[in-house]
UniProtKB/Swiss-Prot annotation:
Source organism: Actinoplanes garbadinensis
Beta-methyllanthionine (Thr-Cys) cross-link, chain position(s): 52-57, 54-62
Name of the protein in question: Lantibiotic actagardine
Keywords: Antibiotic, Antimicrobial, Bacteriocin, Lantibiotic, Oxidation, Thioether bond
Propeptide: 1-45
């Protein structure tokens, strides 16, 4: 590892403020309040149940 790579850290305020991308990935932190509202409708119809079939015992487990 080069000394230059060690020097570049997202904890360094000057580097962080001058950066054009976020270390968590492109588009991180760009959700608006409208995107986060809980009263929005879901995209796909759902009954609220999630079911899975267990291979070991062959039973169906559902949870709400």
């Amino acid at each position: 590892m080069s000394a230059l790579a060690i020097e570049k850290s997202w904890k360094d305020v000057d580097l962080r403020d001058g950066a054009t991308s976020h270390p968590a990935g492109l588009g991180f932190g760009e959700l608006t309040f409208e995107d986060l509202r809980e009263d929005r409708t879901i995209y796909a119809a759902s009954s609220g149940w999630v079911c899975t079939l267990t291979i070991e015992c062959g039973t169906v487990i559902c949870a709400c």
